[in-house]
């Protein structure tokens, strides 16, 4: 999909459809008022007659209005003007693109982004509009013999911005929105693939291809390399599967050679049956999404590379399956991690932290400025926070705040959970340095406490995306989160330099 910024008045737009808004008081927006004048009061009469009362997310499609060059006019209800905030704006934009899909319109003039959204500016409106436009066109039907349903026809979106003083900020927002949307698509495509296709070896192949596309440095550790290094925790998870584990590293060098990199470490369990601690059968198919952290690293690096950010970023992806089998790790087994710490594996379904602890220890050799791990780590985080926000914890408060702010900026929000020393008590083992699980209480926190034991040598934060990486039910599929948060985090860091 192509995007462009238009600075002329809406009545001059000649495309297939033009979109303007109406508030619940039956008040036309400024763009709608200008169109109404060109159409000799036609829009005003429609509104006065009650065909469009302005209730949020109601739509009315009009055709062939005399005096208006566009073939169609889509009126979209904005709700009460005094309540027009972030969520309402985002819902309205989603509704707009959904309403456009069956029209056959190929190019659209959108005059919603100059509306006043509480606490936001026009650039934010544009960035979100671009992301939502691309999201509305997303389809994942590559595994079907025949694509179902009508394919999206919309090819171009012209975003109306009459205030030319915002032109530079708006153009930047447009490019950032496109890069984020492209990164989210990469993340969703990887997540939505069937687990018999998206294996650790497949991810390694995709990483190598991505490295060629964006001139990244690619390397991969095979199981024999991990054995030589002493990655006993990662290998313990892989033992039940015939698919070999991998540890993938992608390096983006956009900053100075002297600048330390930001490291993103993404959990890549391409299918998690739980191992010997077998999961219930219900919804086990969704455990293909347990590589959402890894997928988000792919997506974020895509966005960073497209934007050519002046920053150094390293993506570290430990990837394996977690399956039962005759050679699988058993509850009670004790393994030695890369850090030298021994771990009593009380539950083989607490596997994400096992592969991450070795990946985090491995990341030390890159002397990172900061490290952020991203993982669909715990059901406990979903219980605590639902599917609205991700959980964030860490050993460095400024870093945690950077991530929280990036989430607020992009509306890909996170919530700060505590990491108090008292929680560490739950991880005591009678037979090893640490156990891989605690009690049933505070599970998202104790999982992060476990990881914190392998992050003593760098500034670190942990994003638990178990509730935000995918949707269940009728709209089942990967969400592309937290690519917006991570990309904004890196944009902000690059801007500081």
UniProtKB/Swiss-Prot annotation:
Annotated EC: 3.4.11.1, 3.4.11.10
Protein name (database record): Probable cytosol aminopeptidase
Keywords annotated in UniProt: Aminopeptidase, Cytoplasm, Hydrolase, Manganese, Metal-binding, Protease
Keyword rRNA-binding: no
NCBIfam families on file: PRK00913.1-2 (NF002073), PRK00913.1-4 (NF002074), PRK00913.2-4 (NF002077)
Known function: Presumably involved in the processing and regular turnover of intracellular proteins. Catalyzes the removal of unsubstituted N-terminal amino acids from various peptides.
Organism phylogeny: Bacteria, Pseudomonadati, Pseudomonadota, Betaproteobacteria, Nitrosomonadales
GO molecular function: manganese ion binding; metalloaminopeptidase activity
GO cellular component: cytoplasm
Active-site residues (renumbered): 279, 353
Major localisation: cytoplasm
Names of required cofactors: Mn(2+)
Stated family: Belongs to the peptidase M17 family.
Gene name in the database record: pepA
Pfam families: Peptidase_M17, Peptidase_M17_N
Catalytic activity: Release of an N-terminal amino acid, Xaa-|-Yaa-, in which Xaa is preferably Leu, but may be other amino acids including Pro although not Arg or Lys, and Yaa may be Pro. Amino acid amides and methyl esters are also readily hydrolyzed, but rates on arylamides are exceedingly low; Release of an N-terminal amino acid, preferentially leucine, but not glutamic or aspartic acids
